[in-house]
Amino acid sequence: MNVLILSSSREEIDDYYKSIARSVSNFLANNDCNLVFGGCSSSMMGICYEEFVKKNREIYSFTTPNYVDDLKYLTKCKNYIRETTFELKQDMFNNSDLIVCLPGGIGTYSELLSYIEEKRSNSSDKPIIIYDENNFYNKFLKSLRILVKEKFVDKDIFEMFTVVKNREQFEKKFYNMKGKVK
């Protein structure tokens, strides 16, 4: 199963978030998953890469020409360079069976919203799990509730993804859906 992990590349973030990346990616690599990610060697993204390397899993990184220099640190994966972030998002989506969204910044939000919209508009059944430990995504989820209340989106938007609050919930959700995905 190819799992697309969305997360941060910023080193300045709290180590707490990096520990989430290590825990989740270690669990996935131990459960015979392969990694699809926006090829970056730093912070949460780099930690995910390292955990999958340790388990000799297949790794597929996608990046744009602006970040191609970082690929020299990602020697254990197949690297794909796409001209735009639009192409990058599409190829990561198409090459994954499951999407796991960890805490992240504007790139992570952009990817998450793109994949929710792709699922909503094109009836994709690809699972999306938002890992909301420490209530990181509370304001995002509140914004979606406001959009529903103001009738900008239907309430079924919340059916496009699953929210988990900790590693235990994540593992349970993963095992429940594992048989339903490649």
Predicted segments with their positions:
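Short, acidic/small-residue loops that bind anionic groups at enzyme active sites
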Residues: 63, 119-141, 155-156
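Short catalytic-loop micro-motif centered on adjacent basic/acidic residues
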Residues: 34-38, 101, 129-130
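Glycine-rich beta-alpha loop segments
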Residues: 1-59
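Glycine-rich, charge-decorated loop segments at or immediately adjacent to ligand/cofactor-binding or catalytic sites
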Residues: 43-47, 136-148
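Acidic/glycine-enriched connector segments
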Residues: 44-103, 107-108
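A charged, well-structured terminal subsegment
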Residues: 98, 150-182
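Glycine/threonine-rich flexible loop motifs
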Residues: 14, 109-112
